[in-house]
Amino acid sequence: MGISRDLWRDTLLGLVLTVSFGASALFCVALTRESGGVATLWLPSGLLAAGFVLLPLRRAAWLAAGCTLAGMAVNFAIGAPLDALPVFAGLNLFEALLAAFIVRKICGHRRRVADLATLLRIALFAIIPTTALTAVLAGAALGYLAQSAPQIIIGWFTANALGMAISLPAVLLLADRREGQVPRRSHLEQVVIYGLVALISAIAYLPHSFPTPMLLTPALVAAASRLRPR
């Protein structure tokens, strides 16, 4: 019975992530894609990486196949160059695999975000270096598009790093199955956290040259990791 429950859970998770990958890819390329073909926000790689962290090898292989096909279909539907479709797919797959490998090393066999320190390590040692490396590869592989290689590198890194910082921790937090009781946060800590989120939200939309709304992402993820449901 335990095996069948695990199989059902993994299958359902894989299906949800595949559909979410396709939906988020459509959202990102339809609403945030620039003329050079690179979206300014890219959530799908983080979803795929989370699946690689949470699923066993066989289910992860099916997830990779489903997400690759979904991503290529979305890019084809919005008119991306045919020769760029496998390049986009390969880069996304490589990025997700590398990020998942590092996250597994960081989180250990329990594969969960235990605290803010773990979240920070994931950002510094998994998300940032992985998306930076993939951005360089994207600049080399997609330099024939409308943008120059440096523009593609910068655009890819900012879009994928921000997107993965949103989607990867979110899935890991949602899928977290803690053992034992979750410590209850004090009322003072809850007030401080909510107050900081409100303050950052207010600052984010003041006139600035820096895109301060990006500050909301780490603030909300950090708050979620501290105030997760019991």
PLM region descriptions:
Residues 2-40, 44-147, 167-230:
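Short helix-perturbing small/polar motifs within transmembrane alpha-helices
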Residues 150-163:
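Short aromatic-rich membrane-water interface segments that cap or initiate transmembrane helices
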